[in-house]
Curated annotation (Swiss-Prot):
GO cellular component: nucleus
Biological processes per GO annotation: animal organ morphogenesis; anterior/posterior axis specification; cell differentiation
Organism of provenance: Lineus sanguineus (Ribbon worm)
An example molecular function term from Gene Ontology annotations: DNA-binding transcription factor activity, RNA polymerase II-specific
Name under which the protein is recorded: Homeobox protein CDX
Pfam families according to UniProt: Homeodomain
Length: 70
């Protein structure tokens, strides 16, 4: 398989999480800046944000279920 999984460093994850906390959607300019400073490609950052939003939806769904259950 030519597809490999990117393993982010703790620092990269922390910076991406901080950015996500600030805004769930990243601008093109900010994506370019982050890519440079974190030594990642813009594509990797785009995909990290997509995955992180999906994770948040999943977490929120679980919360909904917990609230609805008696």
């Amino acid at each position: 398989p030519d597809k490999y999984r990117v393993v982010y460093t703790d620092y990269q994850r922390l910076e991406l999480e901080k950015e996500f906390h600030y805004s769930r959607y990243i601008t093109m300019n900010r994506k370019a800046e982050l890519a440079k400073s974190l030594d990642l490609t813009e594509r990797q950052i785009k995909i990290w944000f997509q995955n992180r939003r999906a994770k948040e939806r999943k977490i929120n769904k679980k919360k909904d279920v917990m609230v609805k259950e008696p």
